[in-house]
């Protein structure tokens, strides 16, 4: 029996009803699927039955014999670190430019970089992913909630985010220290052009840089802009100098970016 490896963040899920629910929620019938970290094939066994073509990245080469039991002529596994691979080239070669749907029980320690890589690659259209509950709470959070932060706002600018299911830690082997959550991300048409998107991301990150500081102080410190101009832009949104970042929704940050830079 394969022993989970701590250095790879391995925790294996075995409840077949839950596994099937996760795959069903991804709606991948006759679609192209990329799986990250298939592990012992818990999700893989259901994905390959539905998917048109299947590709996976698995960092642990010792799982090769186990995973090859699930493969057919329309499926393949690359035994490499997803974050260290030339993913765009691999996807172009294998899927020939067609849309792809990402599924994965993500290692907690690399969840955020994987999500940002998903956002960067145009071919990847949706992601149905298992994440640490604390991270999932941030992903689905809304303004004025304690869990709402820069990551929440940036992610929700690029995608529609929905909760699929909460997963108790006791459903894993070995049992991790935290609960999990399955969320689904669906990329959407964005509202700003590319140059303004970079400004939007900068503004959001700076706004949350020091949560105890006001929005005005964070932005005037971080942006090379006149403080009076920033305050004028805030007032045009019916905000004042005491406003803090967590009270702005995604659309508010979009409008603020346009006020400052259009």
Q: Which residue ranges define each predicted feature?
A:
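An accessory alpha-helical subdomain
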Residues: 181-187, 192-232, 237-240, 245-257
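Catalytic cores of RNA-modifying enzymes
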Residues: 1-206, 246, 250
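Generic C-terminal helix-cap and adjacent flexible tail
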Residues: 259-262
């Amino acid at each position: 029996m394969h022993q989970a490896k701590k250095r790879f963040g391995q925790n294996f899920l075995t409840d077949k009803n839950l596994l099937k629910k996760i795959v069903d929620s991804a709606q991948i019938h006759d679609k192209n699927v990329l799986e990250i970290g298939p592990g012992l094939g818990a999700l893989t066994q259901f994905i390959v039955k539905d998917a048109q073509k299947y590709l996976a990245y698995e960092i642990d080469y010792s799982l090769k014999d186990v995973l090859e039991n699930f493969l057919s002529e329309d499926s393949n596994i690359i035994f490499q670190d997803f974050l260290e691979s030339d993913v765009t080239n691999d996807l172009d070669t294998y899927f020939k430019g067609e849309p792809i749907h990402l599924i994965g029980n993500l290692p907690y320690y690399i969840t955020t970089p994987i999500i940002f890589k998903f956002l960067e690659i145009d071919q990847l259209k949706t992601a149905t992913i298992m994440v640490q509950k604390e991270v999932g709470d941030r992903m689905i959070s809304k303004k004025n909630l304690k869990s709402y932060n820069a990551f929440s706002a940036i992610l929700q600018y690029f995608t529609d985010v929905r909760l699929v299911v909460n997963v108790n830690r006791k459903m894993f082997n070995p049992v991790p220290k935290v609960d999990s959550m399955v969320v689904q991300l669906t990329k959407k048409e964005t509202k700003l052009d590319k140059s303004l998107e970079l400004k939007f991301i900068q503004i959001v990150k700076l706004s949350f840089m020091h949560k105890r500081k006001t929005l005005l102080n964070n932005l005037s410190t971080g942006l090379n802009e006149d403080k009076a101009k920033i305050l004028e832009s805030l007032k045009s949104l019916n905000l004042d100098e005491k406003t803090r970042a967590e009270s702005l929704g995604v659309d508010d940050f979009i409008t603020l970016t346009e006020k400052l830079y259009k």
